[in-house]
Swiss-Prot record:
Domain TRAM span(s) in chain numbering: 1-57
CDD domains: AdoMet_MTases (cd02440)
GO biological process, one term: rRNA base methylation
Record organism: Aquifex aeolicus (strain VF5)
Official protein name in the record: Uncharacterized RNA methyltransferase aq_257
Residues annotated for S-adenosyl-L-methionine binding in this entry: Q260, D308, D354
Amino acid sequence: MKDKPLKLTVEKLVYGGYGFSRLNGKAVFVRFASPKELVEAKVVKEKKDYTEAVVTKVLISSPARRKAPCPYYGECGGCQIQHLNYEEQLRSKKDILLESLERIGKIKEVPYEGEIPSKKEFNYRVRVQFKIQENRVGFYRWDVKEVVDVEECLLAHERINELIPHIREVLKVIKDLQEVHVNYSPTRDEATLKFVTITHTDEKLLQNILENVLPEWVVGIGDYGKVGNSLVKRYKVGREHIFMDVGKWQYRVSNDSFFQVNYTLWEDFLKEVLDFSESYKKGLDLHCGVGFFTIPLSEQGNFIEGADANPSAIKDAEYNAKINNRDNVIFEEATAFKHLKRRIGEVINLVVVDPPRSGLLREERDLLLKNKPDKIVYISCNPTTFARDLKILTKGGYELKRLKLIDNFPQTYHIESIALLEVKD
C-alpha cells in the first residue's frame, strides 16, 4: 500500500491541519488536502490504526482551495493550511472545536458565540524562532529536521523579516549559531534577540554585532546554550527586555518571558477575557506570564493573584503592576498546582487558566473541583485537551456558559478559544 498512490475523498479537516478520509474502513490523514476534494495521495506513514499521506494531485478541487501565497509552503513546516482561503480556515477551525467538545467533552449543547478573526492573515507574529543549519536561515521542513532557507516568512512581522540578511551577516563571524529567537514590539519598534550557540560567544564580539551589524531598533542580545531541551542564558549585551503597549496598559517583556504572539488581536483578546470574567472579589490568574490578563483584571475585582513557574515572567509581572499603578495584585513564582494547593479552603470567585497544549494537569483539575471557584475562564490552545478537561469539570459540577474562538494563528492548525464555566445552580 505504501508504494501505491491512493485515491481519496476528503471528508473534512481535523486537528493538525490534515484532511480526513477513509480507505477500506481505515482512517487516512492527508496533508495539504481540502474538505470535499478528490485527491491522489502518497503514503508517508503506515500505522495499525491509521495511515498518513500527502497530496500529490488534486483530481476534484474544493472552491476553498487557493494557491498558497508563500513560495516555501509545502516544504516549510510552519504552516499547514495556507492552501485554504481564510473563510474556510475559520469554518474548519470552528467545526473542529465544536466536534471536539461534543465527541470528547460530551457537551450536547455548546453555547458557541462565534469567531474573532485575526485582523491580518499574514505578518501578524511578533515572536519568531529562526533555525540555522549549514548557513541556511529558516524553519524545519514538515517531514524532517532539515532547515528550509527563506528570504522572508509571511507570518512574521515585516520588521522581523528585515533581520534575515543581518542574521546571514552574523553567521560569517559566529559559525556555530544554531537558532535566533526574535521578540519584537510593534508599539515601540524595538526588539531583543536570543542567539543559541554551541560554544560561548565572546562578549566583545556580541557587543560589536549589536552596535555595527544589527539595525538600531535591536536593543539587546542574549547568548544562550542548550542543555537538553532547555535554553540556559550565559550573558547578555544591551537590554534584555522590550516594552509592549495594549490599549492603556504597558508591559515589560524580557527575553525569557512569554507574550501573546498575534499583535493584531491583543486588544480583542484582552477585551474578551475581561468580558467573560466580569466583576469578582478575589481572583487567581494561573499561568499568568507577565500579567497580560492579570493587571487589567485587577480593575474589575477587589484582589487578584497571578502565578507562573517562570521566574523571568514573574519579575516582569511585578514590574508591570508598578508601572500600571495597580496595588491590588500580587504575583508568585509557582506552578498552577502549587498555587492552587495553597488556596484550599479560601473563597475564590474567579480563576483564569491558560495552560499549555497538554491542558490542565489531573492534580490541577482536582484542586479546581475541590476549591470550587464561582467562575473559571479557560483559555485553550488545543481543542482536544480542552474538551477532555471540560468533560471532567462539567461532571464535577460546572456548566459551560460561553465559548468563543479567537484566531491567533492564521495559516496554521492551532485553535485558540475562550470559555466561561460557572458552578451549576
